[in-house]
Amino acid sequence: MTNPHDIIIKPVVTENSMMEMAEKKYTFVVAKKANKIEIKKAVEKIFDVKVEKVNTMNMIGKMKRMGKHIGRRSNWKKAVVTLTDGSKGIEFFEGM
């Protein structure tokens, strides 16, 4: 995974993730095979910030029903990226 845009898929925009932005913690959906080092390098390259630490979680897809048919959403990986104190915030999230 050499391209940083293949690692960082999209931001997670929830009430909890918005509250964590005050503490310079940003949440992203990332590729399932990406590790913490790859995620750190990708965020630093895309957003031009300094990353202090990365926490990752494997999220289990929810069971969904459509009438009598049962299906399941895909499993996905979530990363919470904490920026250093001297680093500026990520502009992508500022208007939300």
UniProtKB/Swiss-Prot annotation:
Q: Which gene encodes it?
A: rplW
Any matching Pfam family: Ribosomal_L23
- What is the name listed in the Swiss-Prot or TrEMBL entry for this protein? Large ribosomal subunit protein uL23
Q: Which SUPFAM superfamilies match?
A: Ribosomal proteins S24e, L23 and L15e (SSF54189)
User: What family is reported?
Assistant: Belongs to the universal ribosomal protein uL23 family.
Q: Name one GO biological process term.
A: translation
Is rRNA-binding tagged as a keyword?
A: yes
Q: Which UniProt keywords apply?
A: Ribonucleoprotein, Ribosomal protein, RNA-binding, rRNA-binding
Its biological purpose:
One of the early assembly proteins it binds 23S rRNA. One of the proteins that surrounds the polypeptide exit tunnel on the outside of the ribosome. Forms the main docking site for trigger factor binding to the ribosome.
Q: Name one GO molecular function term.
A: structural constituent of ribosome
Task: Give the quaternary structure.
Answer: Part of the 50S ribosomal subunit. Contacts protein L29, and trigger factor when it is bound to the ribosome.
UniProt xrefs under HAMAP family: Ribosomal_uL23_B
Q: Where are the transmembrane segments?
A: none
Q: Which PANTHER family match?
A: 60S RIBOSOMAL PROTEIN L23A
GO cellular component, alphabetical, reads: ribonucleoprotein complex; ribosome
